[in-house]
């Protein structure tokens, strides 16, 4: 046999031996793993504690398997990954099994404790049954003691009530004379609390004319001209009609939308109908008091904003000239906290002087304010200082609002105090500048600084306040305009208040 054939046979045998060795190692590894899994299942089913020892004792199985893979460089990476996943899942299962095992032990322990407690409670119940009669007797004694105490307290309370009743009877005998005085004092207060029913405006024109003629007779005898701030919806020409319906001899109105900067101008038809209605119902145009827009603030230190207010201000005055109205009332304004009151007063007076030059004959009327923060006009001195800086003194005046006056700190609740306030006004401002009155009751207290109007007889002011206005020399032949809330929503409240005030004035005379 040749030499090279022998070498080939030798190498072939060696190669076959190596293959058999590798196969045997792999088979043994898998067989060991299979056995390990079976043992793990058996051990895990018995108790989780034995499984701990199993994991520690059989780590060499996986190390052998991995070493074989590394030595032979086989492409079994997936097998290694599966091995790692098996270990992780086994650990999770082990933790779950431990938790379950602990819960089982706790439940067994608790069941033992419950059994022991039941046994103890049975013994206690036997003892308690014997003692229940003693406890009931003890509780009955306590109840009897409490009942006795309650009886004593009721007797004491009855004695106290009898003593109080005796003292009240004695006080009634003593205070008979004082009661009559208190009744006289509280007459005005009871009038405030009574629910007043306001009659509606008559539907027939004849009845309206009859009521209107009665008011004219009152006005002629007293020289007091009452009216209200009435609606001008649908056009200024409707204002005289609405004033006639409430029996007003004077009235106030807005010549345009009081909450907008721009409004359409008056048409020739508006002006014509307004003049015709004033003649029809015998209105004196000297007793008409238009009210300026709420947006106007001539005291504003900002030049642009003050100019915007001024243009609206002058537009109102020119509308008064178109309607041949002689008075125009407005709120002086506020410093807005951006300048001093002196500077605000100067801004107001400069705007009025400028408006006088651009218009002809309308008298600009300053309304006193309630004393809100930064407002100008709450003090008589403010009004005096504005008037002192006006060039044309014949075209400036003042409107006193009773609610604002009271809220600003001037006490006008009694006849005597109102007289003092008006004398003070005469000395500081001069009563010749008093051109109009806004007649309102006040919801707010004296000196509160709050502008809160109320219906006549329902606020903080007294009937003496309104009697003084109806009879005092300071308020003759000027427009006295109600600005009370229209609680009836049809202005019939103004008709009632006008008639009420005139009748009160007639009784005083």
From Swiss-Prot:
Annotated region (Disordered), positions in chain: 144-188
Binding site for Zn(2+) 1: 291, 331, 367
InterPro entries per the UniProt record, alphabetical: AP_endonuc_2, AP_endonuc_F2_Zn_BS, Xyl_isomerase-like_sf, Xyl_isomerase-like_TIM-brl
GO molecular function, one term: zinc ion binding
GO cellular component, one term: mitochondrion
Role noted for this protein: Plays a role in mitochondrial DNA base excision repair (BER) pathway induced by oxidative stress. Has apurinic/apyrimidinic (AP) endonuclease activity towards double-stranded DNA (dsDNA) with a preference for C as opposite base. Has 3'-phosphatase activity; removes 3'-phosphate from blunt-end, recessed, and gapped DNA templates and thus, removes 3'-blocks for DNA polymerase activity during BER. Lacks 3'-5' exonuclease activity and does not cleave damaged bases by nucleotide incision repair (NIR).
Protein name as it appears in the record: Apurinic-apyrimidinic endonuclease 1
Loss of function: phenotype: Normal asexual blood stage development. Normal transmission from the host blood to the mosquito vector with no defect in oocyst development. Salivary gland sporozoites are normal and are able to infect C57BL/6 mice. Sporozoites can infect host liver and develop into merozoites. No defect in the integrity of mitochondrial DNA.
């Amino acid at each position: 046999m040749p030499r090279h054939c022998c070498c080939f046979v030798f190498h072939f045998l060696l190669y076959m031996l190596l293959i058999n060795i590798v196969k045997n190692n792999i088979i043994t590894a898998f067989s060991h793993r299979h056995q390990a899994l079976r043992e793990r299942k058996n051990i895990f089913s018995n108790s989780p504690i034995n499984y701990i020892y199993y994991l520690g004792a059989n780590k060499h199985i996986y190390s052998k398997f991995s070493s074989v893979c590394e030595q032979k460089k086989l492409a079994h990476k997936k097998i290694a990954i599966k091995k790692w996943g098996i270990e992780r899942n086994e650990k999770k299962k082990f933790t779950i099994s431990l938790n379950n095992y602990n819960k089982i032990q706790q439940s067994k322990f608790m069941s033992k404790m419950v059994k022991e407690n039941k046994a103890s409670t049975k013994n206690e119940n036997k003892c308690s049954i014997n003692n229940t009669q003693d406890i009931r007797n003890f509780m009955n004694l306590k109840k009897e003691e409490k009942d006795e105490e309650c009886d004593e307290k009721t007797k004491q309370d009855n004695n106290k009530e009898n003593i109080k009743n005796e003292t009240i009877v004695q006080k009634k005998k003593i205070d008979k004379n004082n009661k009559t005085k208190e009744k006289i004092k509280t007459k005005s207060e009871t009038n405030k609390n009574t629910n007043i029913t306001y009659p509606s405006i008559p539907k027939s024109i004849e009845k309206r004319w009859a009521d209107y003629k009665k008011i004219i007779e009152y006005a002629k005898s007293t020289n007091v001209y009452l009216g209200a701030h009435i609606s001008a919806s649908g056009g200024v020409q409707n204002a005289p009609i609405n004033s006639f319906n409430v029996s007003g001899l004077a009235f106030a109105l807005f010549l345009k939308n009081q909450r907008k900067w721009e409004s359409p101008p008056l048409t020739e038809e508006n002006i014509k109908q307004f003049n015709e209605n004033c003649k029809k119902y015998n209105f004196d145009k000297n007793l008409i008091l238009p009210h300026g827009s709420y947006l106007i603030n001539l005291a504003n230190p900002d030049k642009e904003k003050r100019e915007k207010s001024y243009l609206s201000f002058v537009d109102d005055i020119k509308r008064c000239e178109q309607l041949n109205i002689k008075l125009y009332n407005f709120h002086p304004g506020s410093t807005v906290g951006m300048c001093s009151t002196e500077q605000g007063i100067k801004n107001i007076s400069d705007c009025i002087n400028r408006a006088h030059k651009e218009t002809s004959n309308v008298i600009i009327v300053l309304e006193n304010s309630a004393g809100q923060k930064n407002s100008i006009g709450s003090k008589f001195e403010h009004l005096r200082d504005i008037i002192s800086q006006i060039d044309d003194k014949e075209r400036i005046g003042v409107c006193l609002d009773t609610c604002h006056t009271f809220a600003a700190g001037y006490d006008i609740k009694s006849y005597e105090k109102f007289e003092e306030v008006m004398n003070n006004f005469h000395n500081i401002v001069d009563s010749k500048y008093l051109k109009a009155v806004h007649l309102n009751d006040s919801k707010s207290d004296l000196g509160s600084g709050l502008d809160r109007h109320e219906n006549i007889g329902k606020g903080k002011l007294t009937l003496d306040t309104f009697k003084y206005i109806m009879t005092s020399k300071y308020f003759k032949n000027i427009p006295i305009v109600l600005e009370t809330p229209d609680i009836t929503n049809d202005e019939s409240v103004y008709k009632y208040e006008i008639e009420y005030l005139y009748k009160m004035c007639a009784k005083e005379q």
